[in-house]
Swiss-Prot record:
Its main location: membrane. One of its GO terms (molecular function) is oxidoreductase activity, acting on NAD(P)H. Part of a membrane-bound complex that couples electron transfer with translocation of ions across the membrane. It is found in: Cell inner membrane. It comes from Haemophilus influenzae (strain ATCC 51907 / DSM 11121 / KW20 / Rd). GO terms for biological process: electron transport chain. This is Ion-translocating oxidoreductase complex subunit G. HAMAP family: RsxG_RnfG. The chain crosses the membrane at residues 11-31. The gene is rnfG. The modification FMN phosphoryl threonine is found at T175. The complex is composed of six subunits: RnfA, RnfB, RnfC, RnfD, RnfE and RnfG.
Amino acid sequence: MGTVKITSRYGILLGFIALLCTIISAGIFFLTKDKIDAVIAAQQRELLLQVIPQDYFNNNLLESAVIPQDKNFVGIQKIYFAKKDGNVSAYAYETTAPDGYSGDIRLLVGLDPKGEVLGVRVIEHHETPGLGDKIERRISNWILGFTNQSINEHNLSEWAVKKDGGKFDQFSGATITPRAVVNQTKRSALIMLNNQALLQQLSTQVK
């Protein structure tokens, strides 16, 4: 009987401790959530500014995101609309190169409506350190080679790595990775440029 009481007492105590830990954890979460959200938002803003210069827009880019549902936008996961005084001046969009050496390479691309690439940044990848990871801005300047490059029907052959007859450098011992980034930037830019009417419709959803 005494053993049963002791066991019951310990059970109640452990339950109380578990409840207390849950309450404390929840309290910490709610106290820090706003700060965490603010840090994430600041990081997102900084990344967007790397592909669309500030003088291109005066709207809130973070609040301008649209997830395209139309089949014409296959390969483009999210579009941010940069607007200047209510008019669309550029797009930043997330796209994925499916053919990296070690899998998907997620990209953020800035593009104006005339086909000028304003910037490209890698959001996520699993490429080989010391080889394919040179696509990261913090490791090399290679990704800056896209900035201010135009794409149109007359120069499509230039949008390839030099090994394939294009103008973009490849990496020594790692051609697959830069090829994947160049090709997906090209493919996705053409999707955007060939669907201006649909983009105009989507832009009405944001301020």
